[in-house]
């Protein structure tokens, strides 16, 4: 967080340019081992998620009404005007449907699961425009709530900016707030300011995660929340030995804290002594007790010199009451694991059957990456989260829209795509013409004079090799953009405008004056053939009127008519093919 704040201050000073305001932390709340923080400032879902992860957490998961109450507390402490705040719920693919997908409507938490006992959607039903589709993310807001004080969920485009976001942090151990004597606090004006590992500061916390610090004024005492090695609970302390002011957390003393001699100091019972930290007490036999026990030794204060051995979690005391042996956690009933349990020394591991994966101590089936895909033909998974669309034989994905398929041919001739219910209805790829009814033949653009100079015909397309008079001399293009050079070098003659050089990477539009296109030639050929047929019919009619012999007329006119199959062609210029 410090790095983010420094960048926000130094960047405008170094460049002299205004920079967008970074989201700022506002109110925070902690409950046992979980903490939550509200950030205000415009941010997309991705930017919000990255900010939370950079602080060691993730966007908030609202799985219960308790978590929803935390959001209400954070909003009440923020004092905003119904902001929209990102939470950790997203729909990567498919469409949101209130009738399917369970209470989350097909959405998933950023932790990769969809477990929840709570949902609060602002839109209970699908609108007239139909359900919104992925990618979608969820923002929570008071403005969308059906009732005051009950923030509701709204689907939003993930690329849109919300007014802020909510982060969630989990810690293995936590400390309660410092205990301060009320009378002493009122007399000396004692105040405590807490700082958390995720950057939250304040004086009102229900719990503080391990790694937090506390500044106690006016004594100048700095305390840290830490879990001692081998203990599950954290407590307040400091590196410097000795007690601090007795009005704050009993001065840190294990037993009694006394300030009668002026400076605060810790006192121990008569049968114990003060240890090196100046706050803990130990019995006189404790210095040799740890050598007798394998893990822990607890002196018995009621019987001087006696002790009790204890073991770490996952172990149990052996028959000799001194050694510790491993406990097989996997034989417990009910089982600690949902499917498979593997015992280890002092612990255990949970595994799943093949085809399942472990998510938050539950075995779930992996989500099919093809679920909700929009592939026109077939979807093929390539990993647990990604897929690709494939097409039928003779087709290939559209480059700019890989979910759709288009006809594809890399040869001079390929079978046409014909409707089985209408055999005469056939289609060919761009750059091909239907031939013999069921075959697509490549159009040789080079024979039609598409290039002013050298030409190379390719399946479905062509290339022009530009000459020295072209702005693209020596390059390959579909239009070399021929220019007229001035042999006299007279800069005053001509139109007075400099020659236009085509922009690299953009194909110039074909000149309206140039070689006749192949479509025009085909149209002329068909028109000529039609004219010949008409002339033959006219000739037969004239000969019949002149009384020509019937046999000759039958020979000329009674013969079976030859079927002429005409293929519809377009006379406009052929677009360039990919």
UniProtKB/Swiss-Prot annotation:
Stretches with biased composition (Pro residues): 499-512
Transmembrane segments: 519-539
S-S bridge residues: 137-158, 246-257, 253-266, 268-281, 289-297, 293-309, 311-324, 330-341, 337-350, 352-363, 370-379, 375-389, 391-405, 409-414, 418-426, 428-440, 446-455, 451-464, 466-480
Residues with attached carbohydrate: 114, 300, 410, 493, 495
GO biological process: blood coagulation
One Pfam family this sequence matches: EGF_Tme5
GO cellular component, one term: membrane
GO molecular function terms listed in the Swiss-Prot or TrEMBL record: calcium ion binding; transmembrane signaling receptor activity
Domain C-type lectin: from-to ranges: 31-167
Keywords linked to the UniProt accession: Blood coagulation, Disulfide bond, EGF-like domain, Glycoprotein, Hemostasis, Hydroxylation, Membrane, Proteoglycan, Receptor, Repeat, Signal, Transmembrane, Transmembrane helix
Stretches of the chain found on the membrane's Extracellular side: 17-518
Membrane topology according to the record: Single-pass type I membrane protein
Topological domains annotated Cytoplasmic: 540-578
Signal peptide residue numbers: 1-16
Record PTM text: N-glycosylated.
Stretches the record annotates as Disordered: 483-512
Domain EGF-like, chain residue ranges per copy: 242-282, 285-325, 326-364, 366-406, 405-441, 442-481
Subcellular location: Membrane
Tissue specificity annotation: Expressed in lung, liver, spleen, kidney, pancreas and lymph node. Low expression in heart, cerebrum, urinary bladder and uterus.
Quaternary data: Interacts with ITGAL, ITGAM and ITGB2. Interacts with thrombin/F2; this interaction switches the specificity of thrombin from a procoagulant to an anticoagulant and antifibrinolytic protease. Interacts with ANGP1 and ANGP2; these interactions significantly inhibit the generation of activated PC and TAFIa/CPB2 by the thrombin/thrombomodulin complex. Interacts with PF4; this interaction enhances generation of activated protein C. Interacts with HMGB1; this interaction inhibits HMGB1 inflammatory activity.
Function: Endothelial cell receptor that plays a critical role in regulating several physiological processes including hemostasis, coagulation, fibrinolysis, inflammation, and angiogenesis. Acts as a cofactor for thrombin activation of protein C/PROC on the surface of vascular endothelial cells leading to initiation of the activated protein C anticoagulant pathway. Also accelerates the activation of the plasma carboxypeptidase B2/CPB2, which catalyzes removal of C-terminal basic amino acids from its substrates including kinins or anaphylatoxins leading to fibrinolysis inhibition.
Name of the featured protein: Thrombomodulin
Origin species: Canis lupus familiaris
Gene: THBD
């Amino acid at each position: 967080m410090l790095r983010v704040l420094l960048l926000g201050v130094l960047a405008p000073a170094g460049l002299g340019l205004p920079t967008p305001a970074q989201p700022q932390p506002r109110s925070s709340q902690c409950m046992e081992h979980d903490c939550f923080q509200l950030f205000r400032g415009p941010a997309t879902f991705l930017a919000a998620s990255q900010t939370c992860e950079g602080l060691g957490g993730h966007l908030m998961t609202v799985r219960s009404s308790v978590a929803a109450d935390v959001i209400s507390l954070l909003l009440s402490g923020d004092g905003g005007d119904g902001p929209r705040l990102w939470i950790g719920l997203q729909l990567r693919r498919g469409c949101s449907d209130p009738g399917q997908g369970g209470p989350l409507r097909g959405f998933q938490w950023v932790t990769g699961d969809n477990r929840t006992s709570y949902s609060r959607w602002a839109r209970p039903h699908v609108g007239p425009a139909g359900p919104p589709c992925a990618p979608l993310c969820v923002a929570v807001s008071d403005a969308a709530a059906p009732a005051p004080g009950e923030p509701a969920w709204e689907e939003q485009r993930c690329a849109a900016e919300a007014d802020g976001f909510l982060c969630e942090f989990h810690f293995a151990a936590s400390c309660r707030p410092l205990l301060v004597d009320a009378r002493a606090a009122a007399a000396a004006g004692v105040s405590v300011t807490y700082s958390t590992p995720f950057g939250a500061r304040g004086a009102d916390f229900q719990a503080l995660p391990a790694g937090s610090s506390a500044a106690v004024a006016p004594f100048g005492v700095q305390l840290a929340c830490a879990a001692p090695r081998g203990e599950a609970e954290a407590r307040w302390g400091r590196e410097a030995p000795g007690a601090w002011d007795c009005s704050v957390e009993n001065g840190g003393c294990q037993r009694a804290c006394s300030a009668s001699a002026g400076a605060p100091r810790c006192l121990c019972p008569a049968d114990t002594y003060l240890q090196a930290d100046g706050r803990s007490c130990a019995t006189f036999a404790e210095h040799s007790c740890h050598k007798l026990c394998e893990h822990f030794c607890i002196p018995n204060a009621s019987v001087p010199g006696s002790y009790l051995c204890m073991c770490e979690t996952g172990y149990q005391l052996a028959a000799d009451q001194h050694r510790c042996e491993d406990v097989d956690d996997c034989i417990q009933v009910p089982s600690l694991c949902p499917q498979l349990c593997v015992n280890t020394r002092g612990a255990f591991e949970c595994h799943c059957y093949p085809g399942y994966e472990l998510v938050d101590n539950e075995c779930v089936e992996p989500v099919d990456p093809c679920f909700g895909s929009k592939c026109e033909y077939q979807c093929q998974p390539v990993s647990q989260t990604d897929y690709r669309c494939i097409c039928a034989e003779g087709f290939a994905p559209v480059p700019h829209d890989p979910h759709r398929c288009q006809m594809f041919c890399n040869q001079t001739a390929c079978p046409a795509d014909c409707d089985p219910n209408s055999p005469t209805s056939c289609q060919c790829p761009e750059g091909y013409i239907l031939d013999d009814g069921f075959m697509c033949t490549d159009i040789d653009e080079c024979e039609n004079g598409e290039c002013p100079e050298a030409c190379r015909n390719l399946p479905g397309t062509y290339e022009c090799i530009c000459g020295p008079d072209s702005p693209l001399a020596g390059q390959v293009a579909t239009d070399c953009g021929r220019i007229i050079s001035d042999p006299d070098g007279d800069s005053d003659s001509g139109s007075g405008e400099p020659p236009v050089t085509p922009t690299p990477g953009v194909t110039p539009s074909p000149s309206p004056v140039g070689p006749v296109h192949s479509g025009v030639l085909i149209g002329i050929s068909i028109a000529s053939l039609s004219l010949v047929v008409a002339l033959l019919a006219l000739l037969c009619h004239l000969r019949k009127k002149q009384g020509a012999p019937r046999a000759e007329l039958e020979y000329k006119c009674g013969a079976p008519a030859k079927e002429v199959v005409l293929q519809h062609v377009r006379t406009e210029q052929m677009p360039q093919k990919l």
